[in-house]
Amino acid sequence: METLQHLILHDMPNSEEIEAVKSGDHTLTYKGYRKRINQLANAMLQKGIQKGDRVALLCKNGHPASTVMFAALEIGAVVVPVSWQLKPYEMTGILKASEPKAMFYGAEFKEILDEVLPELSSLCVTMETGTAYETSAEFEALFAGPDHLPETEMVSPDDTALLMFTSGTTGNPKRCMITHGGIYRYVKKSNSSIARMKGLRFLACHPIYHTSALICIMLGTFAETTFVFTKDQDPVHMLKVIEEEKIQTVMALPVFYTYLLEAWEKHQTDLSSLVILMTGGTKVPSSLISRYLDIGIPLAHGYGSTEAWGISTWTPDMGMDKAASAGKPVAGVKVKVEDPLTGEELPQGEIGEIVVHTPFLFKGYEDNPEATAKVLQNGWFRTGDSGYVDEDGFIFITGRYKDVIIYGGDNVYPDQVEEVIQQIPGILETAVVGIPDPLYGEKPKAFIVKNGGQRITEEDVIAFCKERLSAYKIPEVEFVNELPKNNLGKVKKDVLRNQAVHS
């Protein structure tokens, strides 16, 4: 059966020698990990959790979180990863909508859940797991039972495995139904990724509610990767973990790597164990990739979405001249560019909407057929991203369609302006949005976060841009302490637009 459940039941590693997960002082081999997953799966069945039931997961990165996830999937339950950045009001809304039967949560979230749990009439089982490093006695008691494979009802490839939430930058988050078959095909077709992760020591600092974090866990587990979990992303602590644990690969957002590099330049820890770093989730500045290559560390990045999972990847061996691209489609994925108004396929090099056909595609937004119909058309997924494919087959993303700035009839793509600004030394991150202009309709404005006490002026930024961009692309500049972001780490450009209009 081509399902993720079947993979967990029959193909999960069972080695007594290879370390599977490490949280603090606790280490499990794959054999011990396999045993605990089975024990928890059997305990879930005893508590009445069955195929199709929703199991919400609110835990910091650690072996309790991954064990709960695999145990639930093994019995055919639907895992609902919950962001720990949400406020009680937001969390209540998404959990009410997803109707979990069970909730597993870390001890640090007890206070927020005291407000949330009474609102959830669907809940039958609640379990505090302890912390990422120390499990609670109540949770540990679940592992006293049998460790044989659970006798459970088998799922079909079209059954939902994960209920993920979109970033919700334009309103309430939509619930993406990710199927067992889609994840199965992703694992089976990702031979090169699995080979690259085979036996590596992986620093699992990327929050487990991110799609990219889950992709790494799924692929890495079946590649016998060792996951060293950390519950936060403090760069100085991360450098220490990399050195002491001989970490070979990491997955994180681009801004994390900026902070990490700045910390390394101060502390000069040993990074010689690193083989490759991975990032994605937002545009990756070519300057950041170059800075890592300068110290001998390749930084690869990928393009994808919650709905489509991995779409394309770029690695340094593809050439720095393509570093600003989103790479080439992964195995099994087809990409075309269409006119968003007519649906006509556009020729090579022309900017339009990126549309993909992929065997890993979600099956729709739960209880939202209208939103589903807008993005799923004849087996193709409309990403909402504007971009083009060049003569070598590389995908270039120029922005979100709703983010494109129309300056007197000329299109300004925020990603292009952001890419230029990110090249300025001392810039931590930036976001470019369109603001009203009485003469041209819209004009670009850049919100910029400087790195520490760097002395960079508006004039410096504008002069730098004038050397590299057409006159109509030169933005207004405003320095800010931080950029507003949603719980997935994506910049909330609508907030910046409103801020600019009402300032």
Curated annotation (Swiss-Prot):
Residue ranges that the Swiss-Prot or TrEMBL entry lists as coiled coil: none
Source domain of life: Bacteria
Keywords annotated in UniProt: ATP-binding, Ligase, Nucleotide-binding
EC number: 6.2.1.-
UniProt-recorded Gene Ontology molecular function terms: acid-thiol ligase activity; ATP binding
Paired cysteines (S-S): none
One Pfam family named in its UniProt record: AMP-binding_C
Top EC class, one word: ligase
Family: Belongs to the ATP-dependent AMP-binding enzyme family.
Protein name: Putative acyl--CoA ligase YdaB
The species this protein was found in: Bacillus subtilis (strain 168)
Gene expressing this chain: ydaB
